[in-house]
From Swiss-Prot:
Annotated organism of origin: Haemophilus influenzae (strain PittEE)
UniProt similarity note: Belongs to the bacterial histone-like protein family.
One Pfam family named in its UniProt record: Bac_DNA_binding
GO molecular function: DNA binding; structural constituent of chromatin
Task of the protein: This protein is one of the two subunits of integration host factor, a specific DNA-binding protein that functions in genetic recombination as well as in transcriptional and translational control.
Gene3D superfamilies: IHF-like DNA-binding proteins (4.10.520.10)
Identification of the protein by name: Integration host factor subunit beta
Keywords tagged on the record: DNA recombination, DNA-binding, Transcription, Transcription regulation, Translation regulation
One annotated Gene Ontology cellular component of this protein: chromosome
Biological process, per Gene Ontology: DNA recombination; regulation of DNA-templated transcription; regulation of translation
Subunit details: Heterodimer of an alpha and a beta chain.
Length: 94
């Protein structure tokens, strides 16, 4: 689902809110999560999951095009861990 599709579904579910209000709310939520991660904070949405940063150590990588070794510096990457309720909802036993 894209951000636009999410806004359309929210608009259909909440007809009293304008499309612009929904767009602003979705953008604000994503911005708050991004700012928190940028500040090194963890964001937890109970029952859904948590967003945090994982730190990657510097390592020796390889350029896939040339095969040359490349030194990759340390970096932080966003990480999402699903909560118990979300895991239970998507774990459909066939």
């Amino acid at each position: 689902m894209t951000k636009s599709e999410l806004m359309e579904k929210l608009s259909a579910k909440q007809p009293t809110l304008s499309a612009k209000e929904i767009e602003n709310m979705v953008k604000d939520i994503l911005e708050f999560i991004s700012q928190s991660l940028e500040n090194g904070d963890r964001v937890e949405v109970r029952g859904f999951g948590s967003f945090s940063l994982h730190h990657r150590q510097p390592r020796l990588g390889r350029n896939p095009k040339t095969g040359d070794s490349v030194n990759l510096s340390a970096k932080s990457v966003p990480y999402f861990k699903a909560g118990k309720e979300l895991k239970a909802r998507v774990d459909v036993q066939a």
